[in-house]
């Protein structure tokens, strides 16, 4: 936001001052320093301050409020309507994790992240922003469980619909031990962006969802564990966040079977139907 808007406004102000200094530069020697040009402009009563302004042009980012809605939002008549963003920041992340099938705990062994930030103005700051957003997204996808009050799952949270987990005192945010043991962040080289100052790109929020690579790696690890305990493995649902409870229960071993199937079920159903219950079982939350 700061670089995109304030940077372009600053560029507008600088362009105004440069235009005012052009006649002064022509009067002076070609090797005159900026200080000499500024001093000469001052004594010639040239205004050395400027008010810059910038707003995104409508053809780059905006909405046509008078446009009629398309008949089919997924159809070709709606494929290229409007411009939601001035530009896009691209990124990719690959993560390797290890899960403990007995406790549901996990550790992130390695994460590799590559992000297109255009021509970075300050690579150190951009890399720090990427690291922070990645960890924040990783926490959102693995530990930060939201609990809402409702009649069926959490009736003790009143009134119904109230968010119980309203801060880090009631949900787990990532700590130092949650950081990938090997964390590699790279910026793409040679990428231009003509729609921002110095060809830069915003990087504060875009890398957030890259943390989901840890979530999908956990799901792959769970799938591998389930293939050990369950035959004829099929697709399964892992709800966000991938808490230790959900990881443990979805591994589908005999301990899990015993915990979710009572004695009456064991008496009425065969082994295969009992195991199939694991495919649809989904822990509702840690509370």
Language model: regions and residue ranges:
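Cofactor-centric catalytic regions
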Residues: 1-134, 145-176, 239-287
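Glycine- and acidic
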Residues: 2-4, 119-124, 195-207, 229-233
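C-terminal substrate/ligand-recognition segments
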Residues: 99, 141, 185, 201-225
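Conserved helix-loop functional segments at active or binding sites
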Residues: 117, 144, 191, 224
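Generic long, charged, amphipathic alpha-helical segments
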Residues: 169-200
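Hydrophobic alpha-helical segments
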Residues: 216, 221-228, 250, 254-257
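Glycine-rich phosphate/pyrophosphate-binding loops
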Residues: 221-244
């Amino acid at each position: 936001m700061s670089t995109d808007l304030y940077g372009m406004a600053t560029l507008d102000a600088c362009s105004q001052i440069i235009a005012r200094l052009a006649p002064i530069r022509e009067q002076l020697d070609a090797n005159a320093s900026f200080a000499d040009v500024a001093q000469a402009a001052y004594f010639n009563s040239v205004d050395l301050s400027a008010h810059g302004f910038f707003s995104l042009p409508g053809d780059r980012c905006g909405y046509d409020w008078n446009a009629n809605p398309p008949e089919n939002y997924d159809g070709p008549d709606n494929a290229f309507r409007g411009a939601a963003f001035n530009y896009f920041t691209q990124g990719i992340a690959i993560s390797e994790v290890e899960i403990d099938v007995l406790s549901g705990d996990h550790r992130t062994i390695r994460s590799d992240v590559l992000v297109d930030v255009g021509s970075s103005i300050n690579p150190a700051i951009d890399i720090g922003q990427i690291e922070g957003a990645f960890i924040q997204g990783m926490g959102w996808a693995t530990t930060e469980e939201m609990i809402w009050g409702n009649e069926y799952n959490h009736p003790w949270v009143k009134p119904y619909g109230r968010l119980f987990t309203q801060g880090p005192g009631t949900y787990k945010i990532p700590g130092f031990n949650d950081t990938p043991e090997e964390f590699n962040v790279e910026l793409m080289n040679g990428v231009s962006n003509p729609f921002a100052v110095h060809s830069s790109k915003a990087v504060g929020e875009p890398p957030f969802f890259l943390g989901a690579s840890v979530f999908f790696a956990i799901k792959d690890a769970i799938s591998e564990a389930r293939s050990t305990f369950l035959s004829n493995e099929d697709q399964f649902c892992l709800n966000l966040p991938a808490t230790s409870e959900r990881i443990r229960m979805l591994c589908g071993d005999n301990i899990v079977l015993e915990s979710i199937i009572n004695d009456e079920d064991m008496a009425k159903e065969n082994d295969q139907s009992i195991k199939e219950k694991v495919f649809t079982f989904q822990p509702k939350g840690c509370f």
